[in-house]
Amino acid sequence: MLDQRLVRENPELMARELARRGLTVDLNSLQALAQQQRDLEEQRSSLQAEGNRVGKEVGLKIKAGADPKGSDVAELRQQGNAIKQKVAVLEDEERQLAAELKTQLLTFPNLPSPACPDGRDENDNIEVRSWGDPRRQEGLDEHWAIADRLGLLDSERSVRIAQSRFVTLFGQGARLERALINFMLDLHTGKGYREVLPPVLVNSASLTGSGQLPKFAEESFRCADDDLWLTPTAEVPLTSLHRDEIIPLDQLPLRYVAYSPCFRREAGSYGRDTRGLIRLHQFNKVELYWFVHPDHADEAHAAITADAEAVLQALELPYRVLELCTGDLGFSAARTYDLEVWLAGAGAYREISSCSVCGDFQARRSSIRTKDGKTTRLVHTLNGSGLAIGRTMAALLENGQQADGSVLLPQALVPYFGSDRLQPE
């Protein structure tokens, strides 16, 4: 959530930075709310000061020998009670205004970092670097065809069980999924991340804290009878691990890694990626999450991105790193690096990880702070996929396919999978 002080003190900056995202906003109503709230605060403070003065005067009169039940004291006490009632009314009005202001602020995305390149959409993203030698060869199959041939998954039975955009993995496919999850968790915990296995169901406060609500409610699955949602990413429960907490400064940075199933409606993706593992309603992902001191956010962003890249390098998968422009940033992100893995069958790069620094945006929504000397301040948060399992499997199938129909796997996976290749069953 954006800082309310921006609305009151620098609305021009807020409007200008949102315009970098391609958003034209009218802040007049927001400014009016913020000013009303400030006026009420000043009225309440003035009344409370007057109430304190009256209370002290009562004490002084009694100390000087006045009758506690006398008319002078009674009149002052009556005056004090009237002030308390007025203060209570103002506090109630303040709460209502604060709630309305917060409701409006929750709909605004994060402001882009000054370092984030300006641009309109994904066409303006900037390639930062690449790694590996992409396999460019005619006649290679896409991953869904390879998976069908090897008997790794069944989409038709999944439609019978659930609906479209679900898959059921069998045999080597299920084993490879499990191997990838364990490999990624071991790689990240070996670098000092603390492993977390969070709830798959999360409440509305958690989704609001990470930035999914209220904007993306229609893209998530909600339980009919409870205030619970299927999590779209482990970023949601990881953000709320420290909601409403003050993290001791000497504990920062906190680095977590979590495997979780993820659930998304994929609204607006009709007709795209209808086959295979690229765009599903349910998929598995290993997520990286950092809580850091604000002064260390930039170096943490480089580090979390490098940790996601390390998975691709260990799996010998060619990829490139793109810095997203302002027009392509996610809702909660201030700056993002996307990792795109090469799919040899499709002959294209596809996103497999987004590594974002969110500044204090999520921390303000979730009230996550640290104590810096005598000052309490919001922490900064970062997140990144490390990695999406299904898309990693798709890349392994397409890049490792062999002329005899088998799929050669990278050596790093052999201890987890038990073999260096997938064979037709």
UniProtKB/Swiss-Prot annotation:
Family matches, as CDD domains: SerRS_core
Q: Which SUPFAM superfamilies match?
A: Class II aaRS and biotin synthetases (SSF55681), tRNA-binding arm (SSF46589)
**Binding site residues for ATP:** 264-266, 351-354
EC annotation from Swiss-Prot or TrEMBL: 6.1.1.11
Q: Which pathway is recorded for this entry?
A: Aminoacyl-tRNA biosynthesis; selenocysteinyl-tRNA(Sec) biosynthesis; L-seryl-tRNA(Sec) from L-serine and tRNA(Sec): step 1/1
Q: Does the keyword Cytoplasm apply?
A: yes
Give the GO molecular function terms: ATP binding; serine-tRNA ligase activity
User: Per its UniProt record, what HAMAP family does this chain match?
Assistant: Ser_tRNA_synth_type1
NCBIfam families on file: serS
Please provide the record's free-text comment about the domains of this protein: Consists of two distinct domains, a catalytic core and a N-terminal extension that is involved in tRNA binding.
Q: What is this protein called?
A: Serine--tRNA ligase
